[in-house]
């Protein structure tokens, strides 16, 4: 059974590209999209994702603030920040908020896909 991914990014082009990338992989399915942290919290509670991939810098509520709330509501769901702001300071703040991993948007999409796979582990056959 494919892992359910919630994709969160305020940039529609990036959000759609991420959704397409996950959809093309047999071991993932996109269970929802959101354009900010507040919307991510609402959609996560309805769609019950296996993993959340989220931007750091978004309007309304950023990825760090959303992660703090999501970790309280869904402590077992891995949260991955996919952001252009992937420096040491951002990574430290993200880890303190409960983020499982931080991947730079400048990395190839395969880096993100592999990170999600490693965090969640293999799918039982």
Question: Over which residues does each language-model region extend?
Answer:
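Receiver (REC) domain active-site loop signature in two-component systems and cognate sites
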Residues: 58
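Conserved sequence signature across two-component system core domains
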Residues: 8-9, 34, 52
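Active-site beta3 strand of CheY-like receiver
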Residues: 47-53
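Alpha4 helix (beta4-alpha4-beta5 surface) of REC/receiver domains from two-component response regulators
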Residues: 65, 86-103, 107-114, 118
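Conserved acidic segment of CheY-like receiver
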Residues: 2-14, 18-22
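Short hydrophobic/Thr-rich beta-strand motif most characteristic of the beta2 strand and flanking loop
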Residues: 27-35, 43
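Acidic catalytic/metal-coordinating carboxylates
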Residues: 36-39, 62-65
């Amino acid at each position: 059974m494919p892992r359910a991914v919630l994709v969160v990014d305020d940039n529609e082009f990036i959000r759609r590209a991420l959704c397409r990338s996950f959809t093309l992989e047999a071991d993932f399915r996109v269970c929802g999209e959101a354009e900010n942290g507040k919307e991510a919290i609402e959609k996560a509670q309805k769609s019950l994702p296996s993993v959340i991939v989220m931007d750091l810098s978004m309007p309304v509520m950023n990825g760090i603030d959303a992660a703090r709330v999501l970790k309280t509501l869904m402590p077992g769901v891995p949260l991955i920040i996919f952001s252009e702001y992937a420096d040491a300071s951002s990574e430290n703040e993200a880890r303190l908020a409960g983020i499982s991993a931080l991947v730079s948007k400048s990395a190839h999409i395969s880096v993100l896909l592999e990170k999600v796979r490693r965090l969640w582990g293999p799918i039982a056959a």
